[in-house]
Amino acid sequence: MQQSHQAGYANAADRESGIPAAVLDGIKAVAKEKNATLMFRLVNPHSTSLIAEGVATKGLGVHAKSSDWGLQAGYIPVNPNLSKLFGRAPEVIARADNDVNSSLAHGHTAVDLTLSKERLDYLRQAGLVTGMADGVVASNHAGYEQFEFRVKETSDGRYAVQYRRKGGDDFEAVKVIGNAAGIPLTADIDMFAIMPHLSNFRDSARSSVTSGDSVTDYLARTRRAASEATGGLDRERIDLLWKIARAGARSAVGTEARRQFRYDGDMNIGVITDFELEVRNALNRRAHAVGAQDVVQHGTEQNNPFPEADEKIFVVSATGESQMLTRGQLKEYIGQQRGEGYVFYENRAYGVAGKSLFDDGLGAAPGVPGGRSKSSPDVLETVPASPGLRRPSLGAVERQDSGYDSLDGVGSRSFSLGEVSDMAAVEAAELEMTRQVLHAGARQDDAEPGVSGASAHWGQRALQGAQAVAAAQRLVHAIALMTQFGRAGSTNTPQEAASLSAAVFGLGEASSAVAETVSGFFRGSSRWAGGFGVAGGAMALGGGIAAAVGAGMSLTDDAPAGQKAAAGAEIALQLTGGTVELASSIALALAAARGVTSGLQVAGASAGAAAGALAAALSPMEIYGLVQQSHYADQLDKLAQESSAYGYEGDALLAQLYRDKTAAEGAVAGVSAVLSTVGAAVSIAAAASVVGAPVAVVTSLLTGALNGILRGVQQPIIEKLANDYARKIDELGGPQAYFEKNLQARHEQLANSDGLRKMLADLQAGWNASSVIGVQTTEISKSALELAAITGNADNLKSADVFVDRFIQGERVAGQPVVLDVAAGGIDIASRKGERPALTFITPLAAPGEEQRRRTKTGKSEFTTFVEIVGKQDRWRIRDGAADTTIDLAKVVSQLVDANGVLKHSIKLEVIGGDGDDVVLANASRIHYDGGAGTNTVSYAALGRQDSITVSADGERFNVRKQLNNANVYREGVATQKTAYGKRTENVQYRHVELARVGQLVEVDTLEHVQHIIGGAGNDSITGNAHDNFLAGGAGDDRLDGGAGNDTLVGGEGHNTVVGGAGDDVFLQDLGVWSNQLDGGAGVDTVKYNVHQPSEERLERMGDTGIHADLQKGTVEKWPALNLFSVDHVKNIENLHGSSLNDSIAGDDRDNELWGDDGNDTIHGRGGDDILRGGLGLDTLYGEDGNDIFLQDDETVSDDIDGGAGLDTVDYSAMIHAGKIVAPHEYGFGIEADLSEGWVRKAARRGMDYYDSVRSVENVIGTSMKDVLIGDAQANTLMGQGGDDTVRGGDGDDLLFGGDGNDMLYGDAGNDTLYGGLGDDTLEGGAGNDWFGQTPAREHDVLRGGAGVDTVDYSQAGAHAGVATGRIGLGILADLGAGRVDKLGEAGSSAYDTVSGIENVVGTELADRITGDAQANVLRGAGGADVLAGGEGDDVLLGGDGDDQLSGDAGRDRLYGEAGDDWFFQDAANAGNLLDGGDGNDTVDFSGPGRGLDAGAKGVFLSLGKGFASLMDEPETSNVLRHIENAVGSVRDDVLIGDAGANVLNGLAGNDVLSGGAGDDVLLGDEGSDLLSGDAGNDDLFGGQGDDTYLFGAGYGHDTIYESGGGHDTIRINAGADQLWFARQGNDLEIRILGTDDALTVHDWYRDADHRVEAIHAANQAIDPAGIEKLVEAMAQYPDPGAAAAAPPAARVPDTLMQSLAVNWR
């Protein structure tokens, strides 16, 4: 959003203003709406994007400075060194620090700064950061010390900002000033001025002027004079009217005019008029609509006592046009606007020296364009004032006296309401105006002709007296008012009290006027009694009227009839008593004027007083109140019947208290009425007798005193009652426990209600849950609060609590379903794997935290109990177990507000999932959900059509931005219940949850490990991640993007844009009237229109034509017959499923899957290898190009199928299954298909004639029943599936499958492949080289090869072979000569195949034994350790994997060992064979009996190096050897020669010659006198039995002889005796040839004699073991000469060694 505010500017002035474009559009709209020109100061450019992003703005209460550098640019740092003041003097920083502390002490907060990714990008582009490496950002503040900043990503996708001075050690968080809700602040948009049009106030001001007033006369005269002088609405008249409107004292200008120009004072909004407040609020509402917070916080510079000046001002006219004006241009512009009827009033501070920016009030001053300075234009407008009026202080601003000097002769000085900064000063000004008018009237009276100076003086005294009387009357009326509101049973509200106060005040004014008139009438008389008597009568009438008004306020439309009657009687009685008293007073006054005696005066006064006393004593409203109080007690008794059943007795206790209270108050009222009545009667009687007037006075005083005493003790009496009942509560366990029973009872009452049980049972069924966990927040009852208030216990209770129950089918069951921690905000669901619980909130879940209460005296007889929630209030954490849980968050409190309804903070929900597949039903609250393991779903379906969500994927996390418009959210606040107990009032606060409409609300959810997201009814945007997501838009115009993964996307109702992204995606579309954009993206994607069945009503209205889809054109027309122009545009879609109606579907040149579903559909595959499925109905299917598959599943209709080009298949496998055909096994017949005739009969032999017409179709797949499938001359694939099928291939190379059942397969002509499948099958290959695919199951199959070379293949056996017998690892036993194949690994089993005419066999992956016959066989072992025997004939044997044994037997055979260590058994006399070992360590073996080596036969001559083997001296018997490593000879005299590899040569019996050749060989002579030569390499030589000879010489390497005794063995070394060095190495004898690296070791020579040879020959000399031992001893005396030493010259050999050599070598 950082860049979005730059888009949409209409001109350069708009962009220069720094106001975000979207906000500016709202400003222009408000200017038009209010018909006013709006002027603004330029906005800090670094705050522009923050305002657009939704950051809150500061009011006047924040004096700290913002920052213009670094990552904190645009914000207000708590550390002044990070602000724009960085580098300033220490005292400047200290003052700034004080400003920060002051802001934090007055409702603001210190917030850790976090930035969005877009904000970081903006800061880089703006050059405020110089780079980033490893999360550290360098930021230079020019000319000062460098700071380093670090950003760290937080869990909600933002970046926390930390800082340190360069080179410092630890980073710390950058803190900025935020509002009370914790939202960081940036600069607001300052209004410079507002110029409303005169029409905004002219008419209202004119209509509200009061007639008869000297000020009004002045207004009228000046208006007429201005009109006559100008003849129109020129500037002078506008200025004049504006001055009058600004003067606007309440005595002269009406309410509507004051609405435009009244002032208020507030530390955050400053001095602001109501009109300015309306404009400000309208601007902020517009800002909210585009996602911003309040953007304008306070009034204009016109009201600022310390205004600032700007080089430029941004102006928006009332027509919405905008421009940027310099100070010089502003003067001309304001003049033009004034001429058009727009009003501009100027700030007095502008006229102070050093602050003037204008010549003659509006002039030009130099400055830097666009800069903001410390003063701005100002000219003070004034109105007349009286001398000595105290003006509110303007600080250093000097006072100016200017303006008009007179107002009808009133005053000679001017004062300015523009200087007034609070309401108290306004009231003072109005009183001063009133006083001036009165004095003006007095002076005018003094000047009247015919009135003497003494009379004028008396009149002045009378006026003063009248004013004194009026003041006294106000006091009396106030007493009457308190009396009225103090009566028992009074139910007046504070609003009613305010209205009554106004009425009494007006009555006092009227009484004052009467008193003044009477006094004036008797002007010149010295008698005061008449005037004051009338005044007393007027006071009595005022009291009566006050009481009558109090009663009249209860006459509402919904008041009970009894209350209306009592009020009517009260009004009549009070007005009658007051009128009588006033009449007697007037009569008294007239009598006094005529000189009546003072006794008559007293009598009159007594009679009037008696009438008033009687009226006061008989109060119908008081009687009605006592009766109603008694009825209320009866109602409480009814409540108590139910609450007592659940353990709460408080309602019964409160009922009894009210009965006791009624009795006490009734007694007091009765005695009072008797006293008043007796006193009134005595007074009237005494007054009638005249002479008894003194008695009447005394009686009235006495009864009045007694009544006063009686009424005075009434309140203590009922307070004692309250204390008695408080003690009862203490005795019953104390107030805390007592009132908790009320919460428990209310919980039990709801939990056991039939309505709740039914609702929860329905929820359980709808959610497919095993149980429902109900969480209930219960508020205390109003009656319980009332009882607590009366007994003084309102601070000793909880007003709300949370309860949890588990329900199954609506019935409450035992067990603790969750662990609940209200104080910490924790809900842990105790669930196990396999369960499906559901969590729902029966009543809205209140905020977490604990309740603290305190009772405080807030008035004379008023107490208020305050409640505060403390502890963790901003989050509920819900933990799920291992079950598949549904969590319904629809009724959760989203916001916490204070007692004034001001938002404190939002409440976040944190949901931690477990191992199951969970579903979370979200609401307006901000949630963080971690789904954990399983497939998890979050649904926003509860959101309304006006709301929307935007879901973005961030790796494994989703961020969900919820835009809620006109949102209803549950919010918890503090409500107050007022209880009047006599004259005591108790205001009790309690926790209260309500569903509130909050207008616009934006919340961001974070979701992790969530796969499925469901949108709401609004216009949503949902983007998936790399997993396989299920995304549903719901109603509204949605945008879905699956991203990577195989996603399922549901657009729902509305005009949707759906993008699949990477992966194989599925689009589920409704057959609605909306047009959608569908883009499959990469992968193989499918769109389905068969999700919802249209209703009968829709079908009746819209017909049965479904869609016209063409993937090549990229369009899907819905309801085309109605021309609704409802078209989905599709691209990158490979597969399409139609609707349940009659569809027309065409694919494209890709491989499509096209389904018609129900209805009579027409489908064209076009190019590609397509899958076409008509579904139910009469369908026409065209495969066209490509190898197509037709899926048939409706046996009750006849379809038309044309395969077109390619190899096409019609598949009936899905047609017959449970539910498709009534009693499907009744006959057991499936289909009958004959491709040569072009038809397929469905439900064959059942008397039904449903045929599919098939053309250009090569392949058929049958049903699970008994099918007959016949091919044609083409190469067909025919698959029988289940049932006893008959399958005939016909001509061509066919592929036939029998499937399950006892099938008959006939290959007929051609090279066919036949698979019988399970069941006892008969397979006949017919002509051609056929292939029989078999499995070693328990069935008995018959295989007849027929003509040609045929093969039976058991390679698909897998691990099934041999399982039944327990001989795991054994495969088949096949003997083609015997015509039998045992399939369970042993001969004679019941599971065998009968084979005939079969030449070749392929074994299993296990250990098979396969024997050929006299024919030329191909036997393949496949996997396992197989034994293959070719028998007669020229055979081919292939061992395959495993260590196989191969024997070609007779014939010229080819044997291939392939992988594994294979063993070839070969007859040396059988020539012409090829033995190829393949991979592994392979051996050819001539040792076996019957190998052609009889008594007269010769041995084997074999050379692995040359690759042949034959009989000795008979090369014509040669066989070819390849890849053979080892050889085993015969029992004759053999010659075995190795190759360059590591060979094992075993001579067996006979006198053999073994030559290893190169490589590390192993030679085994075995029996006989053998000759062993290891040759090159390190060889091991085993002579075995017999007289063996070992050859060794130079170049032979390191050979080892292993002797085991027996025979006379000899070592022959090709070297001279003097070239040999003998040494003992452990038990071994080592013989080395000097000058070489060759050595011969005789293993275990020193162990015993059996391991020694009898002689060693070197050249012509020999040595025996004894001589060898002597040489070893002799040579041990000399250093080992090493490999490079040559034979020592005789001259150098010591004599002793020479003697030893000569003696031992002979």
From Swiss-Prot:
Residues 1-399 are annotated as: A, catalytic. PROSITE patterns: HEMOLYSIN_CALCIUM. A lipid is attached at K860, K983 (N6-palmitoyl lysine). Residues 1657-1706 are annotated as: D, Asp/Gly-rich. One of its GO terms (molecular function) is channel activity. Its EC number is 4.6.1.1. Residues 913-1656 are annotated as: C. This is Bifunctional hemolysin/adenylate cyclase.
